[in-house]
Design a protein with these regions (language model features):
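A short, flexible beta-alpha/helix-coil linker loop
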Residues: 17-20, 121-123, 142, 172-175, ...
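Short, basic interhelical loop/turn and adjoining N-cap
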Residues: 452-459, 500-511
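ATP-dependent carboxylate activation and anion-phosphoryl transfer catalytic cores
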Residues: 2, 27, 32, 39, ...
Length: 996
């Protein structure tokens, strides 16, 4: 069948900011869809509110809108652009919900917009709990016993009938938002109320608990003729009860019999056919291992987190193919390597893929490390190996949590077996590590299965690793014999982990291993729907058959798993670097292990290595490919932490040197440089012990900002107000050494914070704009809203900031990107820190200032190889007629037990951008894009300190004119009334009633 000609202009709705449950996999799917549809000759209109995405780049679609994702804004875009098609199933839950809302409001009919890929009634059949249940009943496919509730009272009645525990699932949500497993009446009341609010239609499904059953997923693709293929079978290793986004899983299924897989496929095909999705669908099943009963849990009639994983696990680009099918092509029209065409595809890889989630409980004080039906993970890694053991151990070292194997985590080795078994009763992010120590202490496989419901196959594999580790320890203090070392490497033991186990330097193990000929081999995963594209994984269990070209090559190190402080912004930088290198005539190599990203898409680089970002893995790729150099400054802290060791091993680090990066982190060296340049910094000191810290505090005076060195996202940062607080902080600080001391700075209490990104060639430096933080000093820059260009910084101070930035970049010989953080107190500009690397604001500055920050930096970084002149002298400052406001998106809805106060430790998962011709509208749009509706009526509480009272009247007058009632405290109220503005006085808590 040929492509559709009844649509010419297609609107694609993005998924908005990165939140728990909806991350950069939708940037990956949206970018792929744009590529596919443009290639087929369609005009693309794209709308998304997230500036850190590749899909919102001006070159991805024909017309791009960075606007809030709600029905009103999209209606305005439809009215202006007049698309005749809408593709809703690539923008996650956000895209589907908006499509359904636009349909219900009659907008799509009014403007003649056809929905392609998935019909609106199909969305309702898949997403509406009642519709889905009725459809399953008509097909004779079993579901968990359940009933729908529209109120808490109804839910209580249903739970009584079904028996506790029950699962609550709100309709039209994702990431398990608002839902959960409840064991009693009180829990049900709390969770149900939350669920009814979270649901788009005020509907919650109350379902019998299938806790402990197997959770199995299929990714199915269907075309308009009804032809279906299964892309991937995914086995969740954690049982039901843990959200699939938090669950540890494998592809292919490792313990599920062939006949059961066939039955799952038969049922999945009947469901997908009945819902009539064109493109990818994720179908989730539960199976009771006692009696073999299979039930369907739910489907996602769209690309999802699982489809991104399935795509990367199999080499089948689901989003790309889904877009082509939505445009009218059929599976038999799309060529596919060895199968001929896609309709003949079967998943037949001879390797094992493991997905492991990355959590951020340490960022949320008071959060419970407990996994349930509500997703808590902020990122994930994927690893590929020839065996389960190899892939599993690769996944652990990919996580970047300071662990290179399963043993030695926290203090688990010191705990008695009974305590470890107790800890396993509640699933947590530490579950695999606790099990490992429990097995070491003699836990029985059957007992572990009864507690965790993790199948004996996986527990036995873990037991074999424990036994092998105990065997290895016999060689303590030396490199083991070749046969023992070879077996350890085949089972996935990392060089670094062996070094920790044996007390031998990692270097010695690496040299002995290479000398004995124990080296990684590489194999390609073919990409379906392409002629000869592939990406590569390593294994010690095969012969090397991959071929490295002799072209001029440059390697980019990616950012690894998403986490708070290091997310999609750094992937954006890596992708742009790859594009720029291709234009400069280099073959590009990317190393990364994050399945959600555009950087791990098969055609972003010339060669993709899906590998952990560790010294061992990067060095072996370097040895294989022999690139001219490696770029470490675009992937956040991950590659920077490797840079010095790579350089020691003869790797040419391009751009800013590891020594410069270390100097920026070393407070003494950096302060000496600022003194030399005559640039003010807040007084500071470095402490290794409590006594050091108290002595510094006495000298500088409280409040103080304290933090560890070498961290990203403000990990471990706090504002300390007294000696007692300082003692508590120092006692809790982990891994503090003279090399890595605690940094202590005077906290600039009433300062305005701002930052500047710069492009430098070591001599010439360009600063596109200064960003002003809207939140007060002390809130991490990643959590603060910011405005670009600045609004309240005097021209004089903007010039000072640009001058300081230029002088510092030149002095440090920065080659590439740099980010500078400043604070202005009493009209003095203080330098807070310098980051000689890409920062999370690079996509924001690139978009608002319309400047290709990363391509320019890439040109500079490669100048020694290309001999090209620097682009920096040609860059000119531009005047803006518009204003951009970035607002942070925070995940407190997923951490109900945490106090939602912001501080110097970053907690946001994503961001949105509001753009307009003036600050007010841009700020309004940014707030609107975070799904926080700004109130247009009601009562405003005003209470300000004396210093700010002079600016108060104008603000109060504005609120009064807008029709708001004003209540105010003491002196503030008198001042407002004195200006002729009505206000009601209210007391502070300690002053009496009525109070705040």
């Amino acid at each position: 069948m040929k492509k559709r000609d009844d649509v010419n202009k297609i609107l694609i709705i993005g998924s908005g900011p990165i939140i728990i449950g909806q991350a950069c996999e939708f940037d990956y799917s949206g970018t792929q869809a744009c590529k596919a549809l443009k290639k087929l000759g369609y005009e693309i209109v794209l709308v998304n509110s997230n500036p850190a995405t590749i899909m919102t780049d001006p070159t991805t679609a024909d017309v791009t809108y960075i606007e809030p994702l709600n029905a009103d804004r999209i209606t305005q875009i439809i009215e202006k652009e007049r698309p005749d098609g809408l593709l809703p199933n690539l923008g996650g839950q956000t895209g589907l919900n908006l499509c359904a809302e636009l349909y219900r409001k009659g907008v799509l009919d009014k403007y003649g917009v056809k929905v392609i890929g998935v019909q609106v009634d199909a969305i309702e059949r898949g997403e509406d709990r009642i519709e889905f249940k009725n459809l399953m009943n008509s097909l004779g496919i079993e579901m968990a016993r359940s009933e729908v509730a529209y109120s808490v009272d109804e839910a209580l009645e249903i739970a009584d009938r079904l028996g506790y525990p029950v699962v609550l699932r709100p309709a039209y949500t994702m990431g398990g938002a608002g839902g959960g497993l409840v064991y009693n009446v009180e829990e049900l009341k709390t969770v149900c109320e939350r669920g009814l609010q979270a649901s788009l239609v005020g509907q919650v499904l109350v379902e019998e608990s299938v806790l402990g059953w197997e959770e199995l997923e299929l990714e199915v693709v269907r075309d308009s003729t009804g032809k279906m293929i299964t892309v991937c079978f995914i086995e969740n290793i954690d049982p039901l009860g843990v959200h699939t986004g938090d669950s540890f899983c494998s592809a292919p299924m490792l313990t599920i019999p062939e006949d059961v897989q066939e039955e799952l496929q038969r049922q999945a095909y009947r469901i997908v056919d009945a819902i009539e999705v064109i493109g990818g669908t994720n179908v989730q099943f539960a199976r009771n291992t006692d009696d073999g009963r299979i039930i369907v849990i739910e489907i996602n009639p769209r690309t999802s987190r699982s489809s991104a994983l399935a795509s990367k696990a199999t080499g089948f680009p689901i989003a790309l193919v889904s877009a082509m099918l939505a445009a009218g092509l059929d599976l038999c029209d799309i060529p596919c390597g060895k199968y001929g065409t896609l309709d003949k595809y079967i998943p037949d890889g001879d390797y094992v893929v493991i997905k492991f989630a990355r959590w951020a409980f340490e960022k949320f004080k008071g959060s419970q490390d407990k996994l349930g039906t509500q997703m808590r993970a902020v990122g994930e890694v994927m690893s590929i190996g020839k065996t389960y053991k190899e892939a599993f151990q690769k996944a652990i070292r990919s996580l970047e949590i300071g662990r290179y194997g399963l043993g030695g985590a926290k203090n688990y080795a010191e705990l008695p077996l009974k305590e470890l078994l107790n800890m396993l009763h509640t699933p947590s992010s530490e579950r695999q590590f606790i099990m490992y120590e429990a097995i070491r202490k003699g836990a029985d496989i059957d007992e572990l299965y009864d507690i965790t419901k993790i199948k004996p196959y996986f527990l036995k594999e873990m037991k074999e690793l424990v036994e092998e580790e105990e065997e290895l320890k016999k060689y303590n203090g030396s490199v083991p014999p070749t046969d023992v070392l070879e077996k350890a490497k085949k089972d996935g033991f990392a060089d670094k982990y062996l070094s920790q186990l044996l007390g031998v330097p990692e270097e010695d193990i690496r040299h002995a291993r290479i000398e004995a000929g124990i080296v990684e081999a590489w194999e390609g995963v073919h990409v379906s729907g392409t002629q000869d594209s592939a990406y590569y994984y390593s294994s010690y269990n095969m012969k090397d058959e991959s071929v490295a070209s002799d072209k001029r090559k440059i390697m980019i190190l990616g950012g690894g798993p998403n986490r708070i402080g290091q997310g999609i912004e750094f992937d954006y930088c890596c992708v742009h670097a790859a594009m720029a290198l291709k234009k400069l005539g280099f073959e590009t190599i990317i190393v990364n292990c994050n399945p959600e990203t555009v950087s791990t898409d098969y055609d972003t680089s010339d060669k993709l290595y899906f590998e952990p970002l560790t010294l061992e893995d990067v060095l072996s790729i370097h040895e294989k490919e022999k690139p001219l150099g490696v770029i470490a400054q675009f992937g956040g802290q991950t590659p920077l932490n490797l840079a010095a060791d790579l350089k020691k091993n003869g790797v040419n680090i391009l751009g800013t040197t590891p020594e410069t990066i270390d100097m920026a982190e070393d407070r003494d060296l950096f302060r000496a440089m600022m003194d030399k340049l005559g640039i003010p910094m807040p007084e500071s000191g470095m402490a290794v012990t409590v006594d050091d810290a108290l002595a510094i505090a006495k000298k500088i005076g409280y409040p103080l900002m304290v933090r560890p060195s070498y961290v990203l996202g403000g990990r471990g940062m706090e504002v300390v107000h007294d000696d007692e607080h300082m003692r508590v902080y120092m006692a809790a600080a982990v891994g503090v050494t003279p090399d890595r001391p605690i940094l202590i700075d005077r906290f600039l209490n009433n300062a305005l914070e701002c930052e500047a990104d710069a492009i430098s060639d070591g001599e010439n430096v360009f600063v596109p704009a200064v960003m002003e933080h809207i939140e007060l000093a002390g809130i991490h820059s990643g959590d603060s809203a910011c405005v670009l260009p600045s609004k309240n910084i005097s021209d004089k101070n903007v010039e000072i900031i640009k001058d300081y930035t230029r002088r510092i970049a030149k002095e440090m010989n920065v080659k590439g990107l740099m980010n500078m953080q400043y604070a202005i107190e009493n009209d003095t500009v203080y330098v807070l820190e310098a980051n000689p690397r890409a920062s999370r604001t690079v996509p924001l500055v690139s978009k608002v200032c319309n400047i290709g920050m990363v391509p320019l930096a890439t040109q500079i970084i490669t100048m020694p190889i290309t001999g090209n002149p620097s682009p920096v002298p040609e860059l000119k400052e531009k005047k803006f007629n518009h204003c951009g406001v970035k607002e942070a998106v925070l995940p407190f809805n997923m951490f109900q037990e945490v106090d939602p106060l912001l501080g110097p430790e970053m907690r946001s998962t994503g961001e949105v951008l509001g753009m307009a011709s003036d600050f007010g509208e841009a700020f309004f749009k940014a707030e609107e894009a975070t799904q926080t509706a700004l109130p247009l009526e009601g009562t405003v509480l005003i209470s300000v300190n004396d210093r700010d009272k002079s600016e108060l009247i104008e603000v109060a007058e504005g609120f009064h004119e807008c029709g708001f009632n004003i209540i105010a405290t003491g002196g503030t109220c008198d001042m407002i009334n004195g200006a002729g503005i009505p206000a009601t006085k209210i007391f502070k808590l300690q002053q009496g009633r009525p109070n705040v």
